[in-house]
């Protein structure tokens, strides 16, 4: 793994049904800690990790937001590779809510070989989280929160990351998951340095993609939310893929109608320096 600063590497930026890009998941890194957040919907996670020079042996922390197929099935592949990786040292810590834990454990118990399951027992530690739990991942301090989804139990998180400036004040990253913001979680997000938010499509394209009928939001909504909550930087993800050619430009423009901070609409494999 190359030497890095505090950064996010977007392994995927698409929604559940994309085929030209990968499902939304990312690597959050400081100079001394790496955490994978979700893993997409299959073994495509292995290709994405390889493309950004992250080895399975580098991954010791994995946060899973929820148990939808496009977030959790790639986790099974990561766990399988940890189990069969001869050079793997230490433990893989997997964090998620009770539904996430049940789904992962059920699948691996049903499909992994006995030899692999024995290695899972040795190398993988499952941490079942409750709403509001605080925990440390290396030099990151995390607090998870229930996003109050009506479709599937899902946790976002607030992360305090070491800052590179002289103030020593931590950088705050808020990851909202892939459904609309709930006011109940304001305290986790307000004033954050960085906010990661889903934008299923442009508001201008709402009649085509039906985001509100699917419990999703738009780039316009994300921009309004970022401005209201006083965050400094906005990262949009979990998008449709039919407008990829102009996605970065158009999503940025729409979010900027209301948000005056910096806006990032990353492509797959793009690195964002925090």
Question: What do the predicted segments below correspond to?
Answer:
Residues 2-52, 153-178, 194:
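Conserved beta-strand hairpin/beta-sheet module of binuclear metal-dependent hydrolase folds
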Residues 8, 38, 49, 66, ...:
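Divalent metal-coordination and catalytic microenvironments
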Residues 16, 94, 100-101, 239-244:
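Short histidine/acidic/glycine/proline-rich micro-motifs that form metal-
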Residues 18-20, 128-204:
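Active-site-proximal loop/helix segment associated with metal-binding centers of metalloenzymes
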Residues 36-40, 59-67, 97, 173-179, ...:
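Active-site neighborhood of phospho(di)ester-bond hydrolases with catalytic His/Asp-centered motifs
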Residues 43-93:
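Active-site metal-binding motif and surrounding structural segment of the metallo-beta-lactamase
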Residues 92, 97-153, 162-164, 256, ...:
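Metallo-beta-lactamase
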Residues 170, 180-269:
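Cap/insert and terminal regions of metallo-dependent hydrolase folds
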């Amino acid at each position: 793994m190359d030497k890095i600063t505090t950064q996010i590497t977007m392994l995927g930026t698409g929604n559940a049904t994309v085929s030209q890009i990968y499902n939304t998941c990312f690597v959050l890194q400081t100079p001394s800690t790496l955490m994978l957040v979700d893993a997409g919907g299959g073994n495509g996670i292995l290709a994405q990790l390889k493309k950004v020079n992250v080895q399975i042996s580098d991954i010791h922390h994995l946060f899973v937001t929820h148990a939808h197929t496009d977030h959790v099935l790639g986790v099974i592949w990561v766990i399988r590779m940890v189990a069969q990786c001869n050079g793997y040292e230490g433990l893989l810590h997997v964090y998620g809510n009770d539904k996430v834990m049940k789904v992962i454990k059920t699948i691996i118990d049903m499909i992994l070989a006995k030899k692999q399951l024995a290695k899972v027992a040795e190398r993988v530690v499952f941490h079942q989280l409750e709403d509001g739990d605080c925990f440390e991942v290396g030099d990151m301090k995390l607090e998870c929160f229930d996003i109050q989804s009506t479709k599937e139990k899902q946790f976002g998180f607030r992360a305090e990351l070491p800052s590179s400036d002289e103030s020593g004040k931590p950088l705050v990253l808020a990851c909202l998951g892939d459904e609309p913001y709930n006011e109940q979680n304001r305290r986790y997000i307000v004033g954050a340095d960085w906010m990661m938010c889903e934008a299923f499509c442009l508001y201008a394209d709402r009649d085509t993609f039906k985001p509100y009928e699917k419990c999703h939001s738009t780039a316009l909504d994300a921009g309004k939310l970022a401005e209201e909550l006083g965050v400094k930087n906005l990262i949009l993800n979990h998008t449709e893929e039919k407008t990829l050619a102009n996605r970065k430009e158009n999503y940025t423009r729409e979010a900027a109608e209301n948000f005056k901070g910096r806006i990032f609409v990353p492509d797959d494999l793009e690195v964002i320096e925090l």
